[in-house]
Amino acid sequence: MGHAHAPRRGSLGYSPRVRARSQKPKMRNWAELGDQPKIQGFVGFKAGMSHIVMVDDRPHSATEGMEISVPVTIVEAPQMHVAGIRVYDDSPYGKKVIGEAWISDLKMLESLTHLPKNGYKTDEQLAKIAELVKKGVVADLRVMTVTLTSEVSGIPKKVPELMENRIAGGDMAKRFEFAKSLMGKAVGIKDVFAPGELVDVSAITKGYGTQGPVVRWGIATQKRKHARTGKKRHVGNLGPWNPHRIRWQVPQLGQTGYHQRTEYNKRILKMGDKAEEITPAGGFLHYGLIRNDYIMLKGSIPGPVKRMVRIRPAVRPKNMPKQAPEITYLSTQSKMG
């Protein structure tokens, strides 16, 4: 006798499926780098997609050495301005801030927060951090970076984005000296990543509001006699009589989309500052023209056009070629149809 094979629909690994608190993705893990200090994160804005033709440089691939067509995502990456340093200590309840120092000129943040009238005592705070580093109590060091969204013409937001990015590589003393050298300076995407490198991309996905269980979980619609009740797009059974409650594993309607998602091992195929090389005729749909540095990633990334994306070095990189690929064609045809 046949046996019905009906595994559960949808993954419980993403539950609870609720709206993200902010459009600013959170980085919870970072890769460990070599001996030289380096900023580990960067911020960009999704401009759109295109396709290229490149020579397949993956070893032992069936198309190795041949030209292949590859979909790509273009991300505009304006410069980040380093506004401060923050150091952490490991406590039994997680990381705890034990010191921070800000630059004295923070006019770029006037529209974001209230600034102290007497300014910041930068030198005094840096001396305190240096003493903490010397004592060996600093477990993690990060820089406070500001992205001026007013420099990005493709998005309507003008309030700057303030976030933390980790400094990795070398001992803590080297990291602190490197962070001090960046205070008040601008950092470009080329200072952090290189073509051919693998990165992880985090963003908030496109939101669809409240959707039924068929769209939200992928359950099957009711068939034959069960559909005669007039209800097709609902789960057939909410659970047993006892216990008198519905288990959280039962697929039901609710929020769909607008969740934080991270995609691993996206390869950087191209970087540059000449936007005319990659901008399609008429500009990117719903975005316009790129006026800053850009980064081209292989494949798709989470989120709609104009969404902020955060990029970090891959935490579990695959064995891929580390050099820049050979691109023979880059489509700049109009995306307007």
Swiss-Prot record:
<dbReference type="InterPro" id="IPR009000">
    <property type="entry name" value="Transl_B-barrel_sf"/>
</dbReference>
<dbReference type="GO" id="GO:0022625">
    <property type="term" value="C:cytosolic large ribosomal subunit"/>
</dbReference>
<dbReference type="GO" id="GO:0006412">
    <property type="term" value="P:translation"/>
</dbReference>
<dbReference type="GO" id="GO:0003735">
    <property type="term" value="F:structural constituent of ribosome"/>
</dbReference>
<comment type="similarity">
    <text>Belongs to the universal ribosomal protein uL3 family.</text>
</comment>
<dbReference type="InterPro" id="IPR019928">
    <property type="entry name" value="Ribosomal_uL3_arc"/>
</dbReference>
<keyword id="KW-0694">RNA-binding</keyword>
<comment type="function">
    <text>One of the primary rRNA binding proteins, it binds directly near the 3'-end of the 23S rRNA, where it nucleates assembly of the 50S subunit.</text>
</comment>
<protein>
    <recommendedName>
        <fullName>Large ribosomal subunit protein uL3</fullName>
    </recommendedName>
</protein>
<keyword id="KW-0699">rRNA-binding</keyword>
<dbReference type="InterPro" id="IPR045077">
    <property type="entry name" value="L3_arc_euk"/>
</dbReference>
<comment type="subunit">
    <text>Part of the 50S ribosomal subunit. Forms a cluster with proteins L14 and L24e.</text>
</comment>
<dbReference type="Pfam" id="PF00297">
    <property type="entry name" value="Ribosomal_L3"/>
</dbReference>
<keyword id="KW-0689">Ribosomal protein</keyword>
<dbReference type="InterPro" id="IPR044892">
    <property type="entry name" value="Ribosomal_L3_dom_3_arc_sf"/>
</dbReference>
<feature type="region of interest" description="Disordered">
    <location>
        <begin position="1"/>
        <end position="26"/>
    </location>
</feature>
<keyword id="KW-0687">Ribonucleoprotein</keyword>
<dbReference type="InterPro" id="IPR000597">
    <property type="entry name" value="Ribosomal_uL3"/>
</dbReference>
<dbReference type="GO" id="GO:0019843">
    <property type="term" value="F:rRNA binding"/>
</dbReference>
